C-alpha cells in the first residue's frame, strides 16, 4: 500500500484476516510473513521534521522499530538500529533504506538483556554521530503461555530483561548525553491496560513501561528532555507468528479491532515522528494509544 494521502475507508486500506498459519522460531524474520507487513518502505514520505537529529532505536530490524527507523531517516535523522544477531538479514534491509536517504546509519547487533551491551550501544552511537537526540526503546519479547505454570523462571527473566531491564539500563546510559530538546520514546502496549491471559509476563512488563516512562518524564523535564510512551494495539509484526500468539489466533489476528484488521507498522510511525519532533514541545509523561479503537485507560 503506497497511497497514504488519499481519503479512503481505513477498514479496507490494508489486508484483513483470515491469514495463513505461518509458524516460525523467535525472533522471526519479516521475509517469511504472509501478507508482508507495510513498514513504509514505499508508503512513508518525509518532510525534514527531524533534520540533523541523531536517533538510537532498539528492535529496529522489523515491526514497529523498523518502520520508525525508515521514517526517521526520511525525516532527516541519522539512525542507529539495534537487533539480535539472528535478525541480520532484516537489519541489512533497514540499513540500506536508511542510507538511501543520504543520512548516516549504524548497525548494532547484540542482546539488550546484557547490561553492558546497553552502555556500549550508547557509546557507539555517540562515536558515530557525535551525539544523541532521540532514544526509542522498542525491543520486546513476547511468547505466549496458556497457563501460569508454563511461564518458567527462564521465560519470566528473559521477558523482563528484554522489555523492562533494558529500558532502565539504556536510559541510565543515554540520559547524561541527551541535550535540552531531546526526546525519549518507549513502546508500551494495550496489554498494559487490557492484559491477555496468555501474555502474563509480557503484559506485566508493559505495565511497568508505562509507569517507568511517567516517572522518568518527571525527572528529565528538569533537563529539558521529554519522555513519552506509545501503546500499540494489534499490529501485524513478526512478533505475532514467531510465538507471540497461537497460530489459530494468528489466522484471525486483528479481526476484533474496530477496523476488522490489524494495524500496519507504517500506520503508527506518525506518532513516533511527532513525539520526537519539536512539534510535540509541550508533550511529556503521556501515553499515546494507537489501538485500533480499543482505547487506553
Regions found by a protein language model. Give the residues of each.
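Amphipathic alpha-helical dimer-interface segment in Rossmann-like NAD(P)H-dependent oxidoreductases
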Residues: 123, 127, 162-182, 191-192, ...
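Short, small/polar-rich loop/turn modules that mediate ligand/substrate recognition or access, typified
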Residues: 221, 226, 283-285
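A glycine/serine/threonine-rich, flexible loop-to-helix segment
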Residues: 198-200, 222, 234-258
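Catalytic Tyr-X3-Lys loop
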Residues: 149-168, 185, 209, 259
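A conserved structural motif in NAD(P)-dependent oxidoreductases
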Residues: 257-268, 279
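Conserved mid-core segment of classical short-chain dehydrogenase/reductases
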Residues: 114, 119, 127, 140-157, ...
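Active-site helix of classical SDR
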Residues: 171, 205, 213
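Short C-terminal tail/terminal secondary-structure segment
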Residues: 33, 41-42, 145, 194, ...
Amino acid at each position: 500500500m503506497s497511497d497514504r494521502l488519499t481519503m479512503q475507508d481505513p477498514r479496507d486500506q490494508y489486508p484483513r484476516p483470515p491469514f495463513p498459519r505461518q509458524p516460525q522460531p523467535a525472533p522471526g524474520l519479516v521475509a517469511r510473513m504472509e501478507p508482508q507487513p507495510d513498514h513504509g518502505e514505499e508508503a512513508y514520505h518525509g518532510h525534514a521534521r527531524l533534520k540533523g537529529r541523531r536517533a538510537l532505536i532498539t528492535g529496529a530490524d522489523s515491526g514497529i522499530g523498523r518502520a520508525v527507523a525508515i521514517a526517521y531517516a526520511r525525516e532527516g535523522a541519522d539512525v542507529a538500529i539495534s537487533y539480535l544477531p539472528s535478525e541480520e538479514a532484516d537489519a541489512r534491509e533497514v540499513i540500506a533504506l536508511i542510507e538511501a536517504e543520504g543520512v548516516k546509519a549504524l548497525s548494532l547487533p547484540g542482546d539488550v538483556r546484557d547490561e553492558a551491551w546497553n552502555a556500549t550501544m550508547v557509546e557507539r552511537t555517540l562515536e558515530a554521530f557525535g551525539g544523541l537526540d532521540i532514544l526509542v526503546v522498542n525491543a520486546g519479547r513476547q511468547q505466549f503461555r496458556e497457563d501460569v505454570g508454563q511461564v518458567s523462571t527462564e521465560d519470566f527473566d528473559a521477558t523482563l530483561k528484554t522489555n523492562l531491564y533494558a529500558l532502565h539500563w539504556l536510559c541510565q546510559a543515554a540520559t547524561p548525553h541527551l541535550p535540552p530538546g531531546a526526546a525519549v520514546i518507549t513502546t508500551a502496549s494495550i496489554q498494559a491496560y487490557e492484559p491477555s491471559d496468555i501474555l502474563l509476563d509480557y503484559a506485566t512488563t508493559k505495565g511497568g513501561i508505562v509507569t517507568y516512562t511517567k516517572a522518568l518524564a518527571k525527572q528529565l523535564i528538569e533537563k529539558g528532555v521529554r519522555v513519552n510512551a506509545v501503546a500499540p494495539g494489534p499490529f501485524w509484526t513478526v512478533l505475532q507468528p514467531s510465538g507471540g500468539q497461537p497460530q489459530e489466533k494468528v489466522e484471525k489476528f486483528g479481526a476484533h479491532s474496530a477496523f476488522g484488521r490489524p494495524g500496519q507498522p507504517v500506520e503508527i510511525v506518525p506518532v513516533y515522528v511527532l513525539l520526537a519532533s519539536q512539534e510535540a514541545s509541550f508533550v511529556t509523561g503521556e501515553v499515546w494509544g494507537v489501538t485500533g479503537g480499543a482505547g487506553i485507560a
